UniProtKB/Swiss-Prot annotation:
One Pfam family linked to the record: Ldh_1_N
Protein name (record): Malate dehydrogenase
Function: Catalyzes the reversible oxidation of malate to oxaloacetate.
Binding residues for substrate: R95, R101, N134, R165
Catalytic residues (UniProt): H190 (proton acceptor)
Length: 329
């Protein structure tokens, strides 16, 4: 007997990331090859965006995905999020020319306040929310604060792209396969201040620091390369990373729903006060996932360099939080 379909809401559905994401969700890559889905797609009310969304839906229909039971187009989050089991908040206002970061925060605060309220009112009480649109951590924080009737743990931000980027760099440096590297962490904000940390990472049971014992490379090459990878892709491609971002979103939700099989993964989650990170801040932490729940890896040793990096990325998150505080009243 087939499973009941899960409702997946996606915002910014006609955008670059949306286009790279939707077909993979509909094929079963995110929720399982035996899990039917209903896609509820949100775009801004603008006529051009809605027309583009219609075109994407035509293509989804033309794929004749066996698992895609229904797809609907929306311009109002209150209909798009109705009974949603999973919500991927991809759409966000990008930073325009001459736009200060505080302006970006303010515009996105309005978007994510409205979306948080809509989730609060109409989504499933167990909805799993992943914020992809930047600034992802703070946008997730805004949505969470705007949805007081939903558990805070339902709101997450995407650091999986940074995690995957870091894995790729470590693989290239060590000569080991990406799939064999375990226990990597990316701490903090999804921004260049993040801290990719391979002090606990292993390859086939061996500590990765034994293979890469190079503090200068870690500090001067690895950390900045991971932090600035998005900018490097824009420089090379003329467009921001869309396929890799969509891939990371699928990884994040797949592991959250289906489990990470004991492997550590990075998720931006509300802090419980661990590692000196104030409670409620959405921060990248190492987690394992099973049975639809994530569990933070606790009590890892934080050396002096790591403490400095954790505090550096926290400072940025606190500044962002303070920048939107007045908008959350």
């Amino acid at each position: 007997m087939s499973k009941p379909a899960l409702r997946v809401a996606v915002t910014g559905a006609a955008g670059q990331i949306g286009y790279a994401l939707l077909f993979r969700i509909a094929s079963g890559e995110m929720l399982g090859k035996d899990q039917p889905v209903i896609l509820q797609l949100l775009e801004i009310p603008d006529e051009k965006a809605q027309k583009a969304l219609k075109g994407v839906i035509m293509e989804l229909e033309d794929c004749a995905f066996p698992l895609l039971h229904e797809v609907t187009a929306h311009s109002d989050p209150r209909t798009a999020f109705k009974d949603a089991d999973v919500a991927l908040l991809v759409g966000a206002r990008p930073r325009g020319p001459g736009m200060e970061r505080k302006d970006l925060l303010s515009v996105n605060a309005q978007i994510f306040t409205a979306q948080g309220r809509a989730l609060n009112d109409v989504a499933s009480r167990n909805v799993k929310v992943l914020v992809v649109g930047n600034p992802a951590n703070t946008n997730a924080y805004i949505a969470m604060k705007s949805a007081p009737d939903l558990p805070a743990k339902n709101f997450t931000a995407m650091l999986r792209l940074d995690h995957n980027r870091a894995l790729s760099q470590l693989s290239a440096k060590s000569g080991k396969r990406v799939a064999d590297i375990e226990k990597l962490i990316v701490w903090g904000n999804h921004s260049p201040t993040m801290y990719p940390d391979f002090r606990f990472a292993t390859v086939g049971g061996q500590g990765l620091t034994q293979l890469i014992n190079d503090d200068a490379w870690n500090r001067d090459t690895f950390i900045p390369t991971v932090g600035k990878r998005g900018a490097a892709i824009i420089e090379a491609r003329g467009l921001s990373s869309a396929a890799s971002a969509a891939n990371a979103a699928i990884d994040h939700v797949r592991d959250w729903v289906l489990g990470s099989n004991g492997k550590w993964v990075t998720m931006g989650i509300p802090s419980d006060g661990s590692y000196g990170i104030p409670e409620g801040i959405i921060y990248g932490f190492p987690v394992v996932t099973e049975n639809g729940e994530y569990k933070m890896i606790k009590d890892l040793e934080i050396d002096a360099f790591s403490r400095e990096r954790l505090d550096f990325t926290l400072k940025e998150l606190l500044e962002e939080r303070d920048g939107v505080k007045d908008l959350l009243k």
